[in-house]
């Protein structure tokens, strides 16, 4: 009995540490990008996956101690996919006492009609979903739309665009929506996916599978995700350094004439950002820039619990 109590206390201790880390990450992102302001009504897009559950939980937690007042309304889009457990989210949100709205739109039928069997449907589905969510935000009087993308999603998008699109373009933590009427925020921008996975398992969120539509996975994104995970295992701190690089861009040392006036450089121009280091021996730090070792990840393994299977 004492051993069971000891393990329970340890699990709770580790869960509290993990929640504090996620809360700190979200709080820093909100502050750095001014994501939430006094009186904001935040529409939290809830898919039923680990990321959106975690986002809602951390925002609710921050709401209790934030120096400003803001409200939350959770929104789920029921796209009429076969086997979608429509009872799960209402029951969960009512138990929490969170204001919510379930939007029912048969986008699944539209996608199946337009996209050949076996092909990836995510692109069309995403466009349809985006339009519906913008409309819903207007109807609810939401001032911000919160999406559950995390740090790993942002880095994956950067590499996808570099490898396949020829652009250095990631996923912004805050942006104006396509229709120019809404501000979209990503409060989990600084959060590691592996932390979110552990938190979701420990909290036993009622996860809804994301493959109910039967669409094939994005193989290009999967390749990038596997590459980043491999780097993270083999070279601890590399992911942190790459993300830090996205926050320390030096346009004068790239090749985009829209970002820096290369043509305007003449004799007598000032040295910019350290000048030319091409002939210098670069001093590479022993540890990646911006990286600090987290607490022993093995200690967090105690958080691993079974995720509720949705029948």
Curated annotation (Swiss-Prot):
It is an enzyme of class 2 (transferase). Keywords: 4Fe-4S, ATP-binding, Cytoplasm, Iron, Iron-sulfur, Magnesium, Metal-binding, Nucleotide-binding, RNA-binding, Transferase, tRNA processing, tRNA-binding. It is found in: Cytoplasm. Binds 1 [4Fe-4S] cluster per subunit. The cluster is chelated by three Cys residues, the fourth Fe has a free coordination site that may bind a sulfur atom transferred from the persulfide of IscS. The keyword rRNA-binding does not apply. [4Fe-4S] cluster binds at residues 122, 125, 213. It catalyses: cytidine(32) in tRNA + S-sulfanyl-L-cysteinyl-[cysteine desulfurase] + AH2 + ATP = 2-thiocytidine(32) in tRNA + L-cysteinyl-[cysteine desulfurase] + A + AMP + diphosphate + H(+). Its cofactor is Mg(2+); [4Fe-4S] cluster. A motif (PP-loop motif) lies at residues 47-52. GO terms for biological process: tRNA thio-modification. The thiolation reaction likely consists of two steps: a first activation step by ATP to form an adenylated intermediate of the target base of tRNA, and a second nucleophilic substitution step of the sulfur (S) atom supplied by the hydrosulfide attached to the Fe-S cluster. Catalyzes the ATP-dependent 2-thiolation of cytidine in position 32 of tRNA, to form 2-thiocytidine (s(2)C32). The sulfur atoms are provided by the cysteine/cysteine desulfurase (IscS) system. This is tRNA-cytidine(32) 2-sulfurtransferase. The gene is ttcA.
């Amino acid at each position: 009995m004492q051993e069971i109590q000891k393990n329970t206390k340890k699990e709770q201790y580790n869960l509290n540490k993990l929640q504090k880390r996620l809360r700190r990450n979200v709080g820093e992102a909100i502050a750095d990008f001014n994501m939430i302001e006094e009186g904001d009504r935040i529409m939290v897009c809830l898919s039923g996956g680990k990321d959106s559950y975690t986002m809602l939980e951390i925002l609710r937690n921050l709401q209790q101690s934030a120096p400003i007042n803001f409200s939350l309304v959770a929104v789920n889009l029921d796209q009429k996919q076969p086997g979608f457990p429509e009872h799960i989210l209402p029951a969960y949100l009512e138990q929490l006492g969170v204001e919510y709205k379930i939007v029912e739109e048969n986008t699944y039928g539209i996608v199946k009609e337009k996209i050949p069997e076996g092909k990836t449907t995510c692109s069309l589905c995403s466009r349809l979903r985006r339009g519906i969510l913008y409309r819903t935000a207007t109807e609810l009087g939401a001032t911000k739309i919160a999406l559950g993308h995390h740090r790993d999603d942002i880095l994956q998008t950067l590499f996808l665009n570099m490898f396949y699109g020829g652009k250095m373009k990631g996923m912004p933590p805050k942006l104006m929506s396509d229709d120019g009427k809404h501000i979209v925020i990503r409060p989990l921008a600084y959060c590691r996916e592996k932390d979110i996975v552990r938190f979701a398992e420990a909290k036993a969120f009622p996860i809804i599978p994301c493959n109910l539509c039967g669409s094939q996975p994005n193989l290009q994104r999967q390749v990038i995700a596997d590459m980043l995970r491999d780097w993270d295992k083999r070279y601890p701190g590399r992911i942190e350094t790459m993300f830090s690089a996205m926050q320390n861009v030096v346009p004068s040392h790239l090749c985009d004439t829209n970002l820096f006036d290369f043509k305007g450089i003449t004799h007598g121009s000032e040295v910019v950002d350290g000048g030319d280091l091409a002939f210098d021996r670069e001093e590479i730090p022993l540890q990646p820039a911006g990286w600090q070792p987290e607490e022993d990840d093995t200690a967090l393994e105690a958080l691993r619990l079974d995720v509720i299977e949705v029948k």
